[in-house]
Amino acid sequence: MDMQGKIALVTAAASGAGRAGARILAREGAAVAVVDQNEAGAKAVVDEIKRGGGRALALGGDLRDDGFSRDIVAATVKEFGALDCVWNHLGIPGPSVIDDLEGWDLSVDLNLRSQLITTNAALAEMTARRKGSILFTASTSGLVGSPWSPTYSAAKAGVIGLARALAKRHAKDGVRVNAICPGAIDTPMLRVFVNRPDQPGHNEADPEELIKAAVTRNPMGRAARPEEIAEVAVFLLSDKASFVTGIAMPVDGGTVA
């Protein structure tokens, strides 16, 4: 997946699949804006990329801030001169109850609204140049619904709908828009989620048993490695997927097959 000369922006890129994606993009020749609320973590990823001879920029801030969600696009263009690819990877689990309206607002703000704002700013740049690729991280929960987190399912279903609508709207502008729908990913967030007191089967003494239970619905019997999600993401962002737009691709070991 040759990304030589491309300029990419990745959110939630200080750890997990986002970090893996930033590293792969850089390895394939792209300059990468690494965005994360954990600014120190973003800088660590940038340092790693630069040590490998790549170009990268760390942008730390809270994507619930509309101004920051827009400004990361301008900062990327200012640093590298253009923007070719955006991976909206940010996502957080929502509450397991449906009457937690504060939790609902937070889930929608981070899982959907912030991605829309960043995407709008990116589209202005991409449509002017008549080329670009945008990717959203949705979830299998957005495809089939999760009884453990209805607010997360609703927000991620919104992400899928947004990706499909924008794909149709901007195909004529040379911009492709897709979504990936991971299942369980082996990251610290998975452990935090399954071990929350409000989750069914909560058992603080043995979180690994909860992880095991979380992936039993997966025919492959395990969670994805972050790199397995990131490789698919980079493919969809790349010119190798030049005729692919408007899809919501499960990357889930067969969970929704």
Task: Identify the meaning behind each predicted range.
Residues 2, 80, 116, 123, ...:
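C-terminal substrate-recognition "lid" of short-chain dehydrogenase/reductases
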Residues 3-33:
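Canonical Rossmann dinucleotide-binding motif of NAD(H)/NADP(H)-dependent dehydrogenases/reductases
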Residues 89-94:
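Conserved NAD(P)H cofactor-binding loop of Rossmann-fold oxidoreductase domains
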Residues 95-108, 214:
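Substrate-binding pocket helix/loop in short-chain dehydrogenase/reductase
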Residues 119, 155, 163:
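Active-site helix of classical SDR
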Residues 139:
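Residue(s) in the substrate-gating loop at a strand-loop-helix junction
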Residues 171, 176, 244-246:
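Short, small/polar-rich loop/turn modules that mediate ligand/substrate recognition or access, typified
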